[in-house]
């Protein structure tokens, strides 16, 4: 039997349109990133239905991001093993796929969308090196805190051991322009190694020997202003754009037979001087200009920046618009020696981590395994790694009320950051492990603690879901729990139990207790080709589930089925069944039919807020019912008087156990009208 990893990987690939629809595939810390030929044939809803998938995010006209969380690398490697995908490697694409992926340069994307996409995809592959370097910095700052060394002392005053340790993180930032040049060129479809070689030329000992930063020297009879390009990001970005156009022009005029030799030759010959004379100084000027503007705002009032930054990040990160700020942080470290954005950014991160911690605690209380796994993964990735995407896509973007719990934490934490005027003296990812990199670290600790606990307590006090979402989640948990209990009962049942069940079903004199026991033990499974017809549990008009004015039901998140616009006022059992859940408020009931199909009947939308008023419940949990037995009676006029929709979803909650499930609309449905057909699964 295929593993869960393989099954999910196959599911993703199939619903992306298969290997023939994919032109390139990469991954970052949390997301699988695909470029596809035809985005219209991608079934986003079906991909998102897999429990292992945290979210699906379209990017531009050809990009698709599938959010997997911290195990993304495992899924990436598994997809590479599937038929038709073995030729893909991280970051590589065929020439034709590059043209498709980077068509945005020629007008398929708006320039703003493409600019942010360009920055995001340039920095994404470097994330691993930056994460590793940031933790090495943290260890050295801790050594400074305990008096073992002076983190900011010149290297010639450091012991040899610490000089070596400093080289381990400085290598990433010193040679960052080379990495940026490579990934930026790759994103644009230019040669990544030429993209790396251009900034590398400006970091060689020979170039540095020309003079100090700010000096002017004469090269080719022209004045050249020298700059320190170590740690710079804007010069290699701009140089990569120039390289794209130079390569494109050269390929038009150089015969294909000799392009491999002369395109890189002329590219280097043109782009290195162009970068040294013009593009490099211009890029440094752009970075300094943006940095100076933000510094002026910070100098005018740290409060403004400290509040705005954490309030903006929850909206920037889902769109990938936070990457430009990362570039500015690195620029600040290089030019000012410190950064004033990372501290306030920590307020957003820890408000986010506090929120998912609250979700984790609630999921433990409710025994909600699915949310416990999602929230635990997000919490650990955030607190230990400073990565917010698992929390963002696993919780925040799935439940709209979460932002009302998140933003107060961002605001409160941002205010504290403003009071202490937090600065970072190294580029790090804001996690518990990197607290010592902030100054004053105690003020920063107070700020992130405030952000964390404000959002966490708001979740614990007010929940993170709407009333409907909460009740449906609890209903599903209860149904799953009951299913586990029934499986145990089935496993412990004697071989004679199914026979007894058959006898009880056929004989008129079988007792109720025996019938209840054998109904649980039998728990039949539909064979391939077998069909169960489910009649309407109440009178009314049966309409497609997609027409329900609730995104959770309409998208089939709680299972496929049908919706009834009621004309009657009584919910009845559509078949012999066991009641597995009844809401105290009376607005919902879940049944396990003797066929093994589990259905949820939800009377109206947002009716939970009535607190049971207008509903009369006739059954209780674990009760055996016969077809036609009344389950719930409701006062339709009273519910309408509260301006609540009466449309009633009827969904199959254990759909994964069966094959195709079809909802059948009907103008006048009643207890003899088939509204759902459930087919046995083909093994």
UniProtKB/Swiss-Prot annotation:
Domain PTS EIIA type-1 as annotated: residue spans: 550-654
Membrane topology label: Multi-pass membrane protein
Gene3D superfamilies listed in its UniProt record: Glucose Permease (Domain IIA) (2.70.70.10), Glucose permease domain IIB (3.30.1360.60)
The PTS EIIB type-1 domain, residue ranges: 1-89
Compartment(s) where it occurs, according to its Swiss-Prot or TrEMBL record: Cell membrane
Keyword Cell inner membrane: no
InterPro entries referenced in this protein's UniProt entry, alphabetically: Dup_hybrid_motif, Glu_permease_IIB, PTrfase_EIIB_Cys, PTS_EIIA_1_perm, PTS_EIIC, PTS_EIIC_1, PTS_IIB_1, PTS_Sugar-Specific_Components
Keyword hit for Secreted: no
Entry GO terms, CC: plasma membrane
Source organism superkingdom: Bacteria
Primary location recorded for the protein, binned into one broad class: membrane
GO molecular function, one term: protein-N(PI)-phosphohistidine-sugar phosphotransferase activity
Active site: 28 (phosphocysteine intermediate), 602 (tele-phosphohistidine intermediate)
Residues that span the membrane, as ranges: 126-146, 162-182, 193-213, 225-245, 260-280, 303-323, 344-364, 376-396, 409-429, 442-462
Catalysed reactions, as listed in the record: D-mannose(out) + N(pros)-phospho-L-histidyl-[protein] = D-mannose 6-phosphate(in) + L-histidyl-[protein]
Signal peptide feature range: none
PTS EIIC type-1 domain boundaries: 117-476
GO terms for biological process, alphabetical: phosphoenolpyruvate-dependent sugar phosphotransferase system
Role noted for this protein: The phosphoenolpyruvate-dependent sugar phosphotransferase system (sugar PTS), a major carbohydrate active -transport system, catalyzes the phosphorylation of incoming sugar substrates concomitantly with their translocation across the cell membrane. This system is involved in mannose transport.
Domain remarks: The EIIB domain is phosphorylated by phospho-EIIA on a cysteinyl or histidyl residue, depending on the transported sugar. Then, it transfers the phosphoryl group to the sugar substrate concomitantly with the sugar uptake processed by the EIIC domain.
Name used for this protein in its record: PTS system mannose-specific EIIBCA component
Organism: Corynebacterium glutamicum (strain ATCC 13032 / DSM 20300 / JCM 1318 / BCRC 11384 / CCUG 27702 / LMG 3730 / NBRC 12168 / NCIMB 10025 / NRRL B-2784 / 534)
């Amino acid at each position: 039997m295929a593993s869960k990893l393989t099954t999910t990987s196959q599911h993703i690939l199939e619903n992306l349109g298969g290997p023939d629809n994919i032109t390139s595939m990469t991954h970052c810390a949390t997301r699988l990133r695909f470029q596809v030929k035809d985005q219209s044939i991608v079934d986003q809803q079906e991909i998102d239905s897999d429990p292992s998938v945290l979210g699906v995010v379209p990017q531009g006209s050809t990009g698709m991001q599938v959010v997997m969380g911290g195990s993304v690398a495992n899924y990436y490697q598994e997809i590479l093993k599937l038929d038709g995908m073995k030729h893909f490697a991280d970051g590589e694409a065929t020439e034709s796929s590059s043209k498709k992926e980077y068509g945005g340069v020629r007008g398929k994307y708006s320039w703003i969308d493409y600019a942010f996409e360009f920055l995001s995809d340039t920095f994404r592959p470097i994330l691993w090196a930056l994460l590793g370097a940031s933790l090495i910095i943290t260890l050295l700052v801790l050594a400074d805190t305990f008096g073992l060394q002076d983190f900011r002392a010149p290297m010639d005053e450091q012991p040899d051991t610490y000089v070596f340790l400093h080289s381990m993180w400085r290598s990433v930032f010193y040679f960052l322009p080379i990495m940026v040049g490579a990934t930026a060129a790759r994103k644009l479809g230019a040669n990544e190694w030429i993209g790396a070689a251009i900034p590398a030329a400006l970091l060689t000992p020979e170039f540095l020997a020309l003079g100090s930063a700010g000096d002017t020297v004469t090269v080719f009879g022209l004045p050249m202003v020298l700059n320190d390009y170590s740690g710079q990001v804007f010069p290699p970005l701009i140089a990569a754009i120039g390289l794209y156009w130079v390569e494109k022009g050269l390929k038009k005029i150089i015969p294909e037979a000799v392009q491999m030799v002369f395109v890189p030759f002329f590219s280097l010959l043109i782009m290195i001087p162009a970068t040294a004379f013009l593009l490099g100084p211009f890029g440094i000027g752009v970075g300094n200009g943006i940095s100076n503007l933000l510094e002026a705002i910070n100098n005018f009032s740290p409060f403004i920046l400290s509040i705005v930054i954490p309030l903006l990040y929850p909206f920037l990160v889902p769109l990938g618009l936070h990457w430009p700020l990362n570039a500015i942080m690195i620029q600040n470290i290089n030019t000012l020696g410190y950064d004033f954005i990372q501290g306030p950014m920590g307020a957003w991160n820890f408000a986010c981590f506090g929120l998912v911690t609250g979700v984790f605690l609630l999921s433990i209380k409710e025994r909600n395994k699915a949310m416990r796994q999602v929230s635990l993964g997000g919490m650990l990735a955030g607190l230990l790694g400073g990565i917010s995407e698992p929390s963002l896509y696993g919780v925040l973007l799935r439940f709209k009320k979460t932002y009302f719990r998140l933003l107060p934490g961002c605001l409160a934490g941002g205010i504290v950051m403003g009071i202490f005027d937090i600065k970072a003296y190294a580029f790090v990812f804001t996690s518990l492990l990197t607290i010592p990199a902030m100054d004053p670290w105690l003020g920063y600790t107070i700020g992130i603690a405030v952000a964390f606990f404000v959002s966490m307590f708001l979740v614990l006090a007010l929940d993170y879901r709407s009333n409907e979402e909460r009740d449906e989640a609890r209903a599903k948990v209860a149904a799953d729990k009951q299913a586990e209990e029934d499986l145990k009962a089935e496993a412990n049942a004697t071989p004679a139990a199914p026979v007894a069940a058959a006898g009880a079903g056929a004989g008129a004199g079988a007792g109720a207790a025996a019938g209840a026991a054998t109904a649980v033990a039998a728990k039949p499974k539909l064979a391939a080709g077998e069909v169960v017809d489910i009649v309407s549990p109440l009178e009314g008009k049966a309409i497609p589930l997609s027409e329900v004015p609730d995104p959770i039901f309409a998208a089939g998140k709680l299972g496929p089925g049908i919706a009834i616009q009621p004309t009657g006022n009584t919910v009845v059992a559509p078949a012999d069944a066991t009641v597995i859940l009844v809401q105290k408020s009376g607005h919902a009931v879940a049944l396990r039919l003797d066929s093994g199909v589990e259905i949820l009947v939800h009377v109206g939308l947002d009716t939970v807020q009535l607190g049971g008023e207008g509903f009369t419940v006739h059954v209780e949990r674990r009760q055996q019912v016969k077809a036609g037995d009344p389950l719930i009676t409701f006062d339709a006029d009273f519910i309408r008087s509260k301006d609540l929709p009466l449309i009633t979803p009827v969904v199959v909650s254990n759909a994964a156990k069966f094959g195709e499930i079809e909802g059948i609309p009907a103008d006048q449905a009643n207890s003899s009208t088939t509204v759902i057909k459930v087919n046995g699964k083909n093994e």
